[in-house]
Amino acid sequence: MNKNKIITLLGFFAMSMMVMAQGSEKLVSNQILNQKVVDEGDSGMFNAVALEEKDDKGRDEKANNFKTLWIKNGDRNIFGIIGKPHYTGKKQPIAIIAHGFNGSHTYSLAYFNELNKMGYQCYAFDFPCGSLNSRSDNNTHNMSILDEQSDLETIVKYFKSQPDIDADNIVLIGESQGGLVSALTAASLPKDVTKLVLVFPALCIPDNWNQRYPKVSDIPDTTTLWDVPIGRRFFLEIRDMDVFKTIKRFKKPVLIVQGDADAVVSMDDSRRAVKNYKTASLHVIPSAGHGFKPHEFEESMGVIKEFLSEE
């Protein structure tokens, strides 16, 4: 097996964690300013978060509260945060944001302010078993791409049924492993998802792991990467997954954003995805890696806003 491929594979998980831990926390802290939290505890349904912002004229302006929202998928309880723009009396679009490997909802909050200003409700959540920091379930030994897809499908269907949501304007935004899950979900619910945004999407996960474990007998009961244990089921489920054949079932607009210095996810995979999709574009951020610095995120956010504004 090619040594560089092994390094890339291991780097995917290791660097994802490192980038999230070092970069995304800074990113969130830069985007979510002067945060005030009123925590009512897990016994209640809501933890209110008030954001104090400045409007265009520098005046203090209080944004709508963020609240916790649990969504049930069978016996899986999904913890998330919903942020709503000021109520206009009309149904509102929603952006559902999926984190990457060993991430959490906190890494997705950076999207909220700008999308709320566009009139979008935003929902960021913790995949059960998707992270050691997950408030849904932190048993990563049970991590599963297919379970995460099922969770995201359930979230989409939940919001589609809500009276304050524009069911014809549901957007998925996924980063890294969350990008793979979002792409699979859009393909499985092509009528329910309106637009798809993939940020340095890890569409390579099945191929990379199959290269790492060529035979089923090679897969151990537990694979531990950066102290994150992953069970055998994770690898068994993706062995026959044909990502690029599957994701092209989604025929609606797709935006992919990636840095040209991404050492974890190959730009070739993103280019291949653009060719597979019916309507897709790739925005490349110069010198950006697998995870964006604040100014790179600002560029990404600008492209995403433009994409969502298009008819």
Model-identified regions with their sequence ranges:
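Hydrolase active-site cap/lid region
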Residues: 184-232
